[in-house]
Every structure is written in structure tokens, then in C-alpha cells.
UniProtKB/Swiss-Prot annotation:
It is found in: Cell inner membrane. This is NADH-quinone oxidoreductase subunit A. Its EC number is 7.1.1.-. GO terms for cellular component: NADH dehydrogenase complex; plasma membrane. NDH-1 shuttles electrons from NADH, via FMN and iron-sulfur (Fe-S) centers, to quinones in the respiratory chain. The immediate electron acceptor for the enzyme in this species is believed to be ubiquinone. Couples the redox reaction to proton translocation (for every two electrons transferred, four hydrogen ions are translocated across the cytoplasmic membrane), and thus conserves the redox energy in a proton gradient. NDH-1 is composed of 13 different subunits. Subunits NuoA, H, J, K, L, M, N constitute the membrane sector of the complex. It is a multi-pass membrane protein. InterPro entries: NAD(P)H_OxRDtase_bac/plastid, NADH_UbQ/plastoQ_OxRdtase_su3, NDAH_ubi_oxred_su3_sf. It is an enzyme of class 7 (translocase). One of its GO terms (molecular function) is NADH:ubiquinone reductase (non-electrogenic) activity.
């Protein structure tokens, strides 16, 4: 087996090398061009939002509940799970029973995580103070309360 020299490697991959040089050059050109051609004005009116000729009133920031971020994180976690399971399902013939057992363990670990999230109340949308407590109808009925 013959070792390839660096000139043979370059000769084989010259088109990709030129592509990389041009791509990096264009990125640098756009960054430098934006810096040179961009505006330099720093005034009070430049930093205020403007829409349809109407000055803004109040703050443009919206405060979102942290629950929306939790839902987004859960979506990403379970979306990545689906991605791994899709990759596993396309190669199920090559992985055989070992791959099946590994996928089952993966699903069980994720289900255990989901059960944990449900048990700590991470998926509850109602505030803690407005949650209803479970009432045993035999011992804590309205008629039993009057008798005590």
C-alpha cells in the first residue's frame, strides 16, 4: 500500500479547498463591509422602537411565565428522543436484539424521567395555592364536617 503525499491529497481535494477559501472570504467581506458601511449615529431617538409613524408607549417587553420555557425544554428533550428512536428504527435489522434491548432501556429511562416530572408537579399548570386537595368522600363529606 502506497502512502499518499500531501500534494496528492491537495490535488484530489482542490475544489473543496477553493470552496472553503471563497466561503470564508465572502463571510469576512460581508462582516467588514457591514462594519464600514453601517451607520454610526448614536442618538436617543435611534434607540427607540418605531412602527407605523406612532411613538411607542410603555415597555415593549412581554413577561412570559416560566412554564412556557419548561414546555419548550420538554419538547426539545422528547423531540431528541424521537430523533434517536428514528435513527434506531432505520437500522433495526443491523442492530438486532441487542439494539432492541438498548432502545427499550432508553425508552424506560425516559419514561422514568417523565414519571418523575409528573410526581414533582413540573407539568402542573395551576399555581400551588389554587390546587385542590383530594377529599375522601367517606370521611370528609360536608355532613361529617358538621357532626364533628
Amino acid at each position: 500500500m502506497r502512502m499518499s503525499t500531501s500534494t496528492e491529497v491537495i490535488a484530489h481535494h482542490w475544489a473543496f479547498a477553493i470552496f472553503l477559501i471563497i466561503a470564508i472570504g465572502l463571510c469576512c467581506l460581508m462582516l467588514v463591509g457591514g462594519w464600514y458601511l453601517g451607520g454610526r449615529a448614536r442618538a436617543r431617538s435611534k434607540n427607540t422602537p418605531f412602527e407605523s409613524g406612532i411613538d411607542s408607549v410603555g415597555s415593549a417587553r412581554l413577561r412570559l411565565s416560566a412554564k412556557f420555557y419548561l414546555v419548550a425544554m420538554f419538547f426539545v428533550i422528547f423531540d431528541v428522543e424521537a430523533l434517536y428512536l428514528y435513527a434506531w428504527s432505520t437500522s433495526i435489522r443491523e442492530s438486532g436484539w441487542v439494539g432492541f434491548v438498548e432502545a427499550a432501556i432508553f425508552i424506560l429511562v425516559l419514561l422514568a424521567g417523565l414519571v418523575y416530572l409528573v410526581r414533582i408537579g413540573a407539568l402542573d399548570w395551576t399555581p400551588a395555592r389554587s390546587r385542590r386537595t383530594l377529599v375522601n368522600p367517606e370521611t370528609d363529606s360536608p355532613t361529617n364536617r358538621h357532626m364533628q
